[in-house]
């Protein structure tokens, strides 16, 4: 395995780092506190090409590989995880499946405006009664001949209120179980679609999360993604790739917390010497640095597997499991190293700690990742 990043990768990483430092850092505490959606920053991500990174140039995207995408998510996550999850959900959950499984007509109509950031996408899978178990879809899309009628409620939808385009997973044939599930791509302004209030969350507070309600929504047959009954597989393959983005997010926020803790430990003095000179603190920093590097290797391996068209479901689950657990552990340690200062918003690390928790939950909980990994091991 080649551990060296190419010149192109280094340039992409630097561009994302510069954007995060120069355009995201200012105001990030206030946006988090007010649950304020980063309108200006999302527009800039579109202008810089971050909202269509992996979409082929044919459809207006950057045509970049998954490593490039992971590097960008990592750098942005060091500063603003709300922006990184907006980026991740748009690229991994909305754009990817349309390009992979959509018709040329669907790509022209829906993917192109997503790839250039003219429109924002959202993925509607989770429901009030089915989070981890995606086979139990209560939202229905009943075949009426030349169209489907969509009814149901989706919740925890990232970009829900701001999205122009929804990818929706729904049950069309209860008798067939998960083989009766379909995937659809729908304009958010279609009659019968409404949104619940923005969720007041523990972390990633300036990102947009809400319920989306579908009431007698008419969906043309040409809006179905993939063949009849393909929806469950569509959702699972989408999540496999999405987990690489979440793992990169966890890696980035852990690294951001580590860098802040390292710098603080060198400046803060106790008992006549810097905190970093106390073995208890130095050992914490050593553990953080080692675990971050291990997570990076897992993230990059899963990204390389995806780019080489190898089976990446197993490696992406490992990357997400390890990176998210590591991020939660070490953001707590970063707060501890900061002492009382770590408990106030001014020092950023408390926000990263709050942001870390969701990486253990969305796009498959840590427990779900262990199920996926253990099934592969015991197959």
What does each of the following model-derived ranges do?
Residues 1-89, 101-106, 113, 117-118, ...:
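Alpha-helical interface subdomain recognition
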Residues 49, 73-77, 170, 186-191, ...:
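Short Ser/Thr-interspersed hydrophobic loop/turn segments at strand-loop and sheet-helix junctions
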Residues 100-102, 142, 168-172, 185-187, ...:
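Short beta-strand-to-turn element immediately C-terminal to the catalytic PLP-Schiff-base lysine
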Residues 114, 129-132, 156-159, 173-175, ...:
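Short Gly/Pro-enriched turn/cap motifs at secondary-structure boundaries
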Residues 117-125, 169:
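A short, Trp-centered hydrophobic/proline-enriched beta-strand micro-motif
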Residues 136, 189-220:
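Flexible, small-/acidic-enriched active-site or ligand-binding loops
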Residues 147, 151-196:
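A short core secondary-structure module
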Residues 215-233:
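Long, acidic (Asp/Glu-rich), low-complexity accessory segments flanking structured domains
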